[in-house]
Design a protein with these regions (language model features):
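N-terminal amphipathic/basic leader segments beginning at the initiator methionine
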Residues: 1-17
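A short, well-ordered alpha-helical element
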Residues: 12-15, 31-56
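A general structural motif
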Residues: 21, 54-58, 86-90
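Short, aliphatic-rich beta-strand segments
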Residues: 22-28
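Short, histidine-centered active-site or binding-site loop motifs used for metal coordination
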Residues: 28-30, 63
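Amphipathic alpha-helical interaction surfaces in cytosolic regulatory modules
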Residues: 42, 61-109
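A generic structural motif
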Residues: 117-124
Length: 124
């Protein structure tokens, strides 16, 4: 299985998923014209990854902003990760200390999913 990588643009986040280490990174802004189409290749890739995951899967989220349709796609990503059995899965949610919206979003996701989300402040 190959790694998954998409370069960041002004409207889409960087997506870097290393299958050999289980380290995943999503960073930047997520406001694509069509979130479902943008995230579809990643969701398909995750469907394959969860069949043979690493012993530990660590997903770092460092988003500056995301729109409502992107949040629905994030839930879909998290639902895929919930399907990983027999391996550790952790989501690290990074937010700037003065960004209450991103902090609240991370807290909201903690309520929705069955994966530990570790909240981490990025100090300015």
């Amino acid at each position: 299985m190959e790694n998954f990588f998409l370069e960041e643009t002004s409207k889409t986040p960087k997506l870097s998923f290393d299958v050999s280490t289980g380290k995943f990174l999503m960073s930047g802004r997520s406001i694509p014209e069509n979130s479902i189409e943008f995230y579809k290749p990643l969701l398909e890739w995750l469907d394959e990854y969860i069949k043979k995951p690493c012993a530990k899967t660590e997903f770092d989220i460092k988003l500056e902003y995301f729109n409502t349709s992107s949040s629905k796609c994030l839930v879909e990503i998290f639902r895929r990760l919930e399907k990983i059995k027999g391996a550790e899965v952790v989501i690290n949610w990074f937010y700037e200390e003065d960004d209450e919206d991103m902090q609240e979003s991370g807290e909201d996701f903690k309520e929705l999913i069955d994966i530990p989300i570790i909240m981490s402040v990025i100090e300015n």
